């Protein structure tokens, strides 16, 4: 009985985490199929119905942008996108106007060891 409750809490916790983060790694029904415990299936279905009810009354959440290291200076006409590569961080800088000279993939080493230079209107920042 203890293992069944543990399995239920794990499933519900996983589903709540996926709902909170907006990332669904797998369908909850596949998890139910592997458990093969009737009361777990019922509980998860109730949980799903409860969550769906909550989602109907919630406003769609905007994606929170990933934080960029504070030492990077950005101009209002430029934006930066980060791809998390550990331990090496790669920053790709793009601009609204492609004619402006922007260094792409400015560095491939750790951010603490390298500066990032951004050019907007032929003025170098950073």
Curated annotation (Swiss-Prot):
It comes from the Viruses. This is Uncharacterized protein US5. It comes from Human cytomegalovirus (strain AD169).
